[in-house]
Amino acid sequence: MIKNNYNSSEAKSYIDQAGKDLADQELALRVYTSRIIGQNPDLVMHGGGNTSVKVERKDLFGNTKQVIHVKGSGWDLDTIQAPGLPGLWLDPLRELRNLDKLSDEDMVNVQRANLLDSSAPNPSVETLLHAFLPHKFVDHTHATPFLILANLQIGRAHV
């Protein structure tokens, strides 16, 4: 059984440090919960897995738009900081669901083109999975017990 390591006072500390902007507070909470996940070796192997949060931010013209912050390449969940969860404009990513096919190169180009900060790390290769799911917070882990089961000959019947 997985122990719940969430601590309300620790979470509040992360949120308080983020300032008054609601999107920054939600991102700070995502950083906190990502670290909890990343520090559990039964849930992640070598810092792997991905987390995301969907927030609202204003674009250059002052329009409120949906943004997804998703773990970037090169960051480990157990030590992640806000820059390790680059923000992307969400609507263009969701439009990709309407395509019959999408090459890896086109996917990466669309993701890079929709980063809020062009110098941010590449977002996870699973960014579209996170974007297509409706949930505000998404956790995608590489849980060791399930990976073991899935790789056994008889595993598929039990996963």
Can you describe what each PLM-predicted range is?
Residues 1-21:
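Generic N-terminal amphipathic, Lys/Arg-enriched alpha-helix
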Residues 19-20, 95-97, 147-151:
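Short, functional N-terminal and low-complexity linear motifs
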Residues 22-107, 128, 132:
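N-terminal low-complexity or amphipathic/hydrophobic leaders
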Residues 48-51, 111-115, 143-145:
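Short, glycine/charge-rich beta-strand/loop segments that flank catalytic centers
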Residues 109-137:
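NAD(P)-dependent dehydrogenase/reductase Rossmann-like domain
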Residues 135-155:
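Histidine-centered catalytic micro-motifs
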Residues 157-159:
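Conserved small/polar residues in nucleotide/adenosyl-binding loops
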